Amino acid sequence: MGWIRGRRSRHSWEMSEFHNYNLDLKKSDFSTRWQKQRCPVVKSKCRENASPFFFCCFIAVAMGIRFIIMVTIWSAVFLNSLFNQEVQIPLTESYCGPCPKNWICYKNNCYQFFNESKNWYESQASCMSQNASLLKVYSKEDQDLLKLVKSYHWMGLVHIPTNGSWQWEDGSILSPNLLTIIEMQKGDCALYASSFKGYIENCSTPNTYICMQRTV
């Protein structure tokens, strides 16, 4: 009988230990499952909180880069049109006689702007072949369209070293206060630019040129 009671007591103790062990396993399993379930929730919330912030930063950076690119492009276009584009010249001022085809007729003068680059002597020969001469500036009033010219062009003005004067192809002397002569290079020929300015240039330097033909 004592042996039986001892066996029962040991069995009860083993069952109690087994029950406690199961409880510990269940608690441990529940804790593990709870942590596994909680972690994705926490991570998901972190991602939900972080994603809008990084998305907003990305959009802001992209818009900033686009703005810089657009400003650069428009600045380049503006500067190019400012320095290189010729202003449209009015063609309806006063009576004008017949001019060669495609020439500009303005206040009894015919003008042609040639975009090909030649030295001064070649430009002079080109104008003479068309029964014209290089540009001669003789009146700010009658030639006010020349204020609109933007780039540099050969005109028929040359420097005479013997007396230091400037004269036109026809031998007439440059009238005082008609042109402002600016020394850009060492030379004996002159380029016309905007606002009745003449720029000294070496005669052998290639430049565009203006031919002129009087109609009266």
UniProtKB/Swiss-Prot annotation:
InterPro entries given in the database record: C-type_lectin-like (IPR001304), C-type_lectin-like/link_sf (IPR016186), CTDL_fold (IPR016187), NKG2D (IPR042169), NKR-like_CTLD (IPR033992)
UniProt-annotated location(s): Cell membrane
Gene3D superfamilies (alphabetical): Mannose-Binding Protein A, subunit A
Transmembrane segment boundaries: 52-72
Alphabetical keyword list: Adaptive immunity, Cell membrane, Differentiation, Disulfide bond, Glycoprotein, Immunity, Innate immunity, Lectin, Membrane, Receptor, Signal-anchor, Transmembrane, Transmembrane helix
GO molecular function: carbohydrate binding; identical protein binding; MHC class I protein binding; MHC class Ib receptor activity; signaling receptor activity
GO biological process annotation, one example: cellular response to lipopolysaccharide
Membrane topology: Single-pass type II membrane protein
Keyword Glycoprotein part of the UniProt annotation: yes
GO cellular component: cell surface; external side of plasma membrane
Tissue expression remark: Natural killer cells.
Further comment: Is not capable of signal transduction by itself, but operates through the adapter protein HCST.
Annotated protein name in UniProt: NKG2-D type II integral membrane protein
